[in-house]
Amino acid sequence: MALKALLGLSQAQLETWAKDQGLPPFRGRQLHDWLYAKGARHWHDITVLPAALRQQEPLPLGRSNELERHLAQDGTLKLLLATDDGLSLETVGIPTRDRLTVCVSSQVGCPMACRFCATGKEGLQRSLEPHEIVDQVLTVREVMQRRPSHVVFMGMGEPLLNSDHVLTAIDCLSRDLGMAMRQITVSTVGVPNTLPRLAELALERLGRAQFTLAVSLHAPDQALREELIPTARAYPYEQLLEDCRHYVAISGRRVSFEYILLGNLNDSPRQAQALAEQVRGFQSHVNLIPYNPIAEEEFQRPEPARVDAFAAALKQRGVAVSVRASRGLDQNAACGQLRRQRQGGR
């Protein structure tokens, strides 16, 4: 099988590759340094390799081409990147004073069709390869000239429909880029028969399941959840929560829950009370996300007072809660707004 990309290979794998080329193992270590520390983009740029090797047919490093970049007023960066097969994807860099979070995509498009999310409006093209996920982190690092501290799989796609490649990418981010696995979050809207298996696969392949799992609920009951998330019809609320309990038992890590707040639809104090009942016993954290508008839907962003009241109702019932600040709204880079659309940026 032809090598798809060098990016994503470990130092040991690159040393083996060097041996196969008749080179000493230290060439593999040098290549590892150029791929991950220096962020090499082109084969010919790796000047430590022998000239004769560099002049041969270039090997695929696995780096994307930047199509557009958009910088929001709050400093959030949105990049439109091109894949080798002519598709495109979006990734986002979210800076604060003491951290840089990269919001990565796991698929080109998304099949889940959540009504409040722009990505699902275009359907699924394909799942991303591990190197295409790692490349997003390297590209944001390169453009923003800052080392990413956190990675969240909250961009385009449903990570649990690409769990094999997602876990491979997480392994690379931890092993080769030195990221703490606890600073990596995998977000899912829920796919039947995948949550316990994700924990088992992480233990088998990574030796631990230390990344954070964030499960998107978005409603306090099955009926409303089905209205917002069509695929929820195949995944009863009770079964989703039971699978979350199994995940916790296997991984030893708590689950966090995400809840998008839609004005006058799922943001009442009564619904907050119902949500608190659903997550009772999880010792979990609920992350509230005020809706970020998209063109195709008429959902409303909730008034700040309703957001505060919803959060207060959860806290009164012993639920740890936070409200996510919307970042990159003026460039359609906020949660739920990614869609592979060219806007004429740099």
UniProtKB/Swiss-Prot annotation:
Residues covered by the Radical SAM core domain: 96-330
Active site: 90 (proton acceptor), 335 (s-methylcysteine intermediate)
Residues reported in the UniProt entry to bind S-adenosyl-L-methionine: 157-158, 187, 216-218, 292
Disulfide pattern: 103-335
Gene Ontology MF terms in the entry: 4 iron, 4 sulfur cluster binding; metal ion binding; rRNA (adenine(2503)-C2-)-methyltransferase activity; rRNA binding; tRNA (adenine(37)-C2)-methyltransferase activity; tRNA binding
Named cofactor requirement(s): [4Fe-4S] cluster
Any single Gene Ontology cellular-component annotation: cytoplasm
Binding site for [4Fe-4S] cluster: 110, 114, 117
Pfam families on file: Radical_SAM, RlmN_N
Catalyses which reaction(s): adenosine(2503) in 23S rRNA + 2 reduced [2Fe-2S]-[ferredoxin] + 2 S-adenosyl-L-methionine = 2-methyladenosine(2503) in 23S rRNA + 5'-deoxyadenosine + L-methionine + 2 oxidized [2Fe-2S]-[ferredoxin] + S-adenosyl-L-homocysteine; adenosine(37) in tRNA + 2 reduced [2Fe-2S]-[ferredoxin] + 2 S-adenosyl-L-methionine = 2-methyladenosine(37) in tRNA + 5'-deoxyadenosine + L-methionine + 2 oxidized [2Fe-2S]-[ferredoxin] + S-adenosyl-L-homocysteine
Cell location: Cytoplasm
InterPro entries noted in UniProt: Aldolase_TIM (IPR013785), Methyltransferase_A (IPR040072), RlmN_N (IPR048641), RNA_MTrfase_RlmN (IPR027492), rRNA_lsu_MTrfase_RlmN/Cfr (IPR004383), rSAM (IPR007197)
EC number: 2.1.1.192
Note describing how the cofactor binds: Binds 1 [4Fe-4S] cluster. The cluster is coordinated with 3 cysteines and an exchangeable S-adenosyl-L-methionine.
GO biological process: rRNA base methylation; tRNA methylation
Keywords from the named record: 4Fe-4S, Cytoplasm, Disulfide bond, Iron, Iron-sulfur, Metal-binding, Methyltransferase, rRNA processing, S-adenosyl-L-methionine, Transferase, tRNA processing
NCBIfam families: rRNA_mod_RlmN
Reported function: Specifically methylates position 2 of adenine 2503 in 23S rRNA and position 2 of adenine 37 in tRNAs.
Additional remarks: Reaction proceeds by a ping-pong mechanism involving intermediate methylation of a conserved cysteine residue.
Family classification: Belongs to the radical SAM superfamily. RlmN family.
Name this polypeptide is given: Probable dual-specificity RNA methyltransferase RlmN
Organism: Synechococcus sp. (strain RCC307)
